[in-house]
Amino acid sequence: SEIPEGFKEARGFHFSPLPLYPLAELINTLPEDAWIQVDPHYEWFFPEYREEWERILRRVSVVLPSEDEFTKFFDIPLAFDIDNYKKHMRELSAMGPPIVVLKMGPQGAILYLKDEDVFYSIPSCAEHVVDVTGAGDSFCGSLLYNYVSGDDIITAAIKGMVGSSITLENTSADENFHVAEGVAMERFRRVEASVREKIKIL
């Protein structure tokens, strides 16, 4: 549960799914003002762990559950009931994170900004789906990188969708690690306007 001191100077930290207790230990080693993004582990994001999550989420800037994880955590039906989802996204944000991103698979994502008390529906920009493995991870990583690099959160989320769309077209992790430089930015420029037109305030 140790993070090298040099790493602690990073502009942001993303925690992919980890068991609950190592996750808490790692987060507690980071500076108080660190920008921390957490993608919950599906085996640990359940109501019985709520107290532990409340302690963890006090330190978290962005939490990004999948729809399945989110509905299990709040013990609500997996059915797109936007009013019910909004209620529980606010509840999740009240535990600490000013930003909640609900990953919705082919439907894209719902983004909640606590400071504005506003929900945005961010559509997917997938063009050709070969393998869904890693698409959510690419979304999370792209969103974090672009946000801490200076983009506003909506632009960062669109770039997250672009990263996800590229991963969806590949058949292996090796392909994902060898995407040519500039491919993502070229796609972003091509799809940005059409994606922004489809973004809705919920």
Label every PLM stretch briefly.
Residues P17-P22, Y42-F46:
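Short beta->alpha connector loops
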Residues Y21-T29, E51-R55, T155:
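A short acidic, amphipathic alpha-helical/loop segment
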Residues P31-W35, Y42-F119:
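Conserved phosphate/ATP/ADP-binding segment of small-molecule kinases
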Residues D81-L202:
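Conserved phosphate-binding/catalytic region of the ribokinase-like
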Residues I3, E52-W53, V129:
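Acidic, amphipathic alpha-helical patches
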Residues E5-K8, A24-P31, S93-M95, G182-V183:
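Alpha-helix C-terminal capping segments
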Residues P40-W44, C125-E127:
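Short, acidic/turn-prone active-site loops that include or flank metal/cofactor-
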Residues S1-Y21:
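Conserved phosphate-binding/catalytic loop of the ribokinase/pfkB sugar-kinase fold
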